[in-house]
Curated annotation (Swiss-Prot):
GO cellular component: cytosol
Matches recorded under Gene3D superfamilies: 2.30.30.100
Database matches in PANTHER family: RNA-BINDING PROTEIN HFQ (PTHR34772:SF1)
Keyword Ribonucleoprotein: no
NCBIfam families: Hfq, PRK00395.1
The encoding gene: hfq
UniProt key word RNA-binding: yes
SUPFAM superfamilies: Sm-like ribonucleoproteins
Protein known as: RNA-binding protein Hfq
Pfam families to which the protein is assigned, alphabetical: Hfq
All residue ranges annotated as the Sm domain in the record: 10-69
A biological process from GO: regulation of translation, ncRNA-mediated
Function in brief: RNA chaperone that binds small regulatory RNA (sRNAs) and mRNAs to facilitate mRNA translational regulation in response to envelope stress, environmental stress and changes in metabolite concentrations. Also binds with high specificity to tRNAs.
């Protein structure tokens, strides 16, 4: 994964995690998962609902927050 991708993903996912924002995660096969982001790294997201699920990023299509979230990507990410 490129560094530029991480410059956008990390601040967004971290804001969702820190603010405990509920999210809907849609997978590439159409399945919808819901919960709170507990943690993440370069390859996976830990999603907590009644249990914690490890979701591989390559299987994720879309992450939809339940409410707007403020995050500050590096200026380089917007170029």
């Amino acid at each position: 994964m490129s560094n530029k991708g991480q410059l956008l993903q990390d601040p967004f996912l971290n804001a969702l995690r820190k603010e405990h924002v509920p999210v809907s995660i849609y997978l590439v096969n159409g399945i919808k998962l819901q919960g709170n982001i507990e943690s993440f790294d370069q390859y996976v997201v830990l999603l907590r609902n009644t249990v914690t699920q490890m979701v591989y990023k390559h299987a994720i299509s879309t992450v939809v927050p339940a409410r707007p979230v403020n995050f500050h990507p590096d200026a380089e990410a917007s170029s």
